[in-house]
Amino acid sequence: MAASVSTVGAVNRAILNLNGSGAGASAPTSAFFGTSLKKAVASRVPNSKVTNGSFKIVAAEKEIEESQQTNKDRWKGLAYDISDDQQDITRGKGMVDPLFQAPMDAGTHYAVMSSYEYLSTGLRQLDNIKDGFYIAPAFLDKLVVHITKNFMTLPNIKVPLILGIWGGKGQGKSFQCELVFAKMGINPIMMSAGELESGNAGEPAKLIRQRYREAADLIAKGKMCALFINDLDAGAGRLGGTTQYTVNNQMVNATLMNIADNPTNVQLPGMYNKEENARVPIIVTGNDFSTLYAPLIRDGRMEKFYWAPTRDDRVGVCKGIFRTDGVPEEDITKLVDTFPGQSIDFFGALRARVYDDEVRKWISGVGVDATGKKLVNSKEGPPTFDQPKMSLDKLLQYGNMLVQEQENVKRVQLADKYLNEAALGNANEDAIKSGSFFK
């Protein structure tokens, strides 16, 4: 018992010594505390040498200097903001009286986007796009001129805010845009057709305004930016009588029209301020702009560009697709001329088909029942393949197979048969006629 009491007393004396009291040096000499602790004690207690018998209490250093805090502090709003994106005006409902929701800054509607290093979900990083891809000269000229013109102040000239790029499916509209953005050093704010519809009325229109203001905030910080909307006609257009035209379709068209007319005064619903935002060029892609609301695509609001790649453009893009496979340029030219009616995307799918043989060899080697264990839960890592040799004959063979699959989809049209006949009806008739049914 006496031993335990003496131990406690020794510990208490050691603690007092750490705080600069008692006899002797303030820092203990025992190796138990280590050199790092001695350094820490010396830094925390500047006046370590004191007279014997005195007891000195040293206050801890201030860890936060209030005078050094700035308005650009990234986390400053955590004490006041209860939303997760500082913009969602619907989360403020029910927390304050609707009469005071907008003008009193009480809720989460206050849409100030100058938060320090704002983290965005719509910002697209294009740093991974490397050299070697072909950019069509006409495409590059149209996009660069439109973006540059929107950042200039031209005398007595009304510049259309929106550039609409439309054309056939799979012709590389979106990818060419990304290549131009990368060449200009622009990280665009991205949207797609799937974001132009919602279960809540007005949400897509509000999202467009939010993304536009986000791009404007980046421009105000000195970074070139643009708003890029993919497949606008798929989300806001009318594709025949079976398409349901909703309030959100109307609101998306009306919002884009309003932004095109007032590009420096884009407000969120319920929140209006007098400060002008930066002008942001908008680039949209689509397949058929005749399905859009006609006043939206008039010349003063939208500049239209029909993208139909020439033979030279198709050959140039295909050289980029096969650039790592060692395919001679004359073979690429012959391949493009063999399938003149196919989209550019067809040649990318054709290249992917060549790897099917390598995948079959790997599956036969590990067994069908072990593919899941090898691919998902393997300690060996993912499988690696030697790059297959792509000869012109093999590419033509797989190309004809893809064309045959396209013809089957157009020719058979089983949906019409299912609607007109009971059960399968004559669904196998096509296979019987082609001779592949009894193989």
Swiss-Prot record:
Domain of life: Eukaryota
Subcellular location: Plastid, Chloroplast stroma
Pfam families per record: AAA, RuBisCO_activase_AAA_helical
Chloroplast keyword on record: yes
Residues that, per the record, bind ATP: 167-174
Membrane spanning stretches: none
GO molecular function: ATP binding; ATP hydrolysis activity; ribulose-1,5-bisphosphate carboxylase/oxygenase activator activity
SUPFAM superfamilies: P-loop containing nucleoside triphosphate hydrolases (SSF52540)
Disulphide connectivity of cysteines: none
UniProt-listed InterPro entries: ATPase_AAA_core (IPR003959), P-loop_NTPase (IPR027417), RCA-like (IPR044960), RuBisCO_activase_AAA_helical (IPR048571)
Gene Ontology annotations for the cellular component aspect, listed alphabetically: chloroplast stroma; thylakoid
Swiss-Prot/TrEMBL keywords: ATP-binding, Chloroplast, Nucleotide-binding, Plastid, Transit peptide
Physiological role: Activation of RuBisCO (ribulose-1,5-bisphosphate carboxylase/oxygenase; EC 4.1.1.39) involves the ATP-dependent carboxylation of the epsilon-amino group of lysine leading to a carbamate structure.
Family label: Belongs to the RuBisCO activase family.
Protein name: Ribulose bisphosphate carboxylase/oxygenase activase, chloroplastic
Gene name of the record: RCA
